[in-house]
């Protein structure tokens, strides 16, 4: 085994809880190692999440941007044009950030949802990832990761739910799930 060092493409997917949380843990570790991190949340809107306050403590070492409305209209034959526009804007910013080399780690939170809902082309994302600067790491999160995304990735983790408190009527807990 060689001692190869290069930026990784990491996918956190699957139906279980913890995809974004795992990405946040990796981001925190990266900041602790002196790296700069950008996290773009493709679908989350202006709702308040605890991690937003925590990230502010890192200044320009860890920047998080919410790029969506906070919800997506699903079930229609075609995605809502407003959702598509917001996803395209988020992707344009993400692609620019990745290619700039300004960030050591770029987290594309919930991008897999955007792709699976037909709001973004997986092939376009993969093509851009293939051109990224050598030492830039990218994490893509969300359920239903597209097969071409999985193929392009170096590491793929599938989260699966074994048991969840919600099934017993316990609502989401502040500081734990938001």
Where in this protein do the model-derived segments appear?
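Phosphate-binding/switch loop-helix module in NTP-utilizing enzymes
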Residues: 74-137
């Amino acid at each position: 085994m060689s001692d190869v060092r290069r930026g990784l493409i990491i996918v956190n997917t699957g139906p279980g809880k913890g995809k974004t949380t795992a990405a946040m843990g990796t981001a925190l570790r990266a900041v602790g190692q002196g790296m700069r991190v950008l996290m773009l949340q493709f679908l989350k809107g202006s709702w308040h999440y605890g991690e937003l306050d925590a990230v502010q403590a890192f200044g320009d070492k860890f920047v998080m941007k919410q790029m969506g409305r906070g919800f997506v209209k699903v079930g229609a034959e075609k995605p809502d044009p407003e959702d598509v526009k917001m996803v395209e804007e988020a992707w344009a910013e993400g692609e620019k950030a990745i290619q700039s080399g300004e960030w050591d780690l770029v987290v594309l939170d919930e991008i897999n949802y955007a792709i699976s809902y037909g709001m973004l082309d997986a092939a376009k994302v993969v093509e851009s990832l293939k051109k990224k600067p050598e030492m830039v790491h990218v994490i893509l999160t969300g359920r239903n990761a597209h097969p071409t995304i999985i193929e392009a990735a170096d590491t793929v983790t599938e989260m699966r739910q074994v048991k969840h408190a919600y099934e017993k009527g316990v609502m989401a807990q502040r500081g734990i799930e938001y």
